[in-house]
């Protein structure tokens, strides 16, 4: 029986890892592979789209995109993501903190990223064992800014809002934390 009675929830992109170059290159390559003639502006991607659900931002980049094209680009991106993982950077300070609090806190990731991409990056950096629960885009009906993922993590461990803390970098993550009525720490540095 575990003596843990607290939960720390971490976002992945921009919080635990700087993945903007990984995501940018993977999406740009996936779009090119579908023969759609669109170039994503790097600065726009970093400021406006990185960390957001593909269903939210791809239609803003590619006008009149069909559901089939949307899914194809996303599936291609998931499959080529690991080719660019050398561009990812780990937030060493947060990982040191996780190691310090792990005895008293359950540690979870709640992210809009795909399960495959989350597992790829955790394996690349050999840190998967630090996390008790991964909640990815496939595990929720409503991605951030919905609070669904955070609430799911709290319910899974039966931990109250008062004993939960969320680490987020993006505005949509902060909105989700507010909706869940959970205290949060805004992580700066990558975005």
PLM feature segments, named:
Residues 33-64:
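Alpha-helical substrate-recognition element adjacent to the catalytic core
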Residues 1-6, 115, 120-191:
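Asp-based, Mg2+/Mn2+-dependent phosphohydrolase catalytic module
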Residues 1-44, 179-180:
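Active-site neighborhood of HAD-like aspartate-dependent phosphohydrolases
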Residues 94-123:
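Substrate-recognition element of Asp-dependent hydrolases with the DxDx(T/V) motif
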Residues 22, 49, 53, 76, ...:
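Short beta->alpha linker loops
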Residues 16, 47, 107, 142, ...:
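Conserved SAM-binding loop
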Residues 24, 28, 51-59, 115:
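An amphipathic alpha-helix signature
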Residues 59-96, 105:
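Metal-dependent phosphoesterase signature
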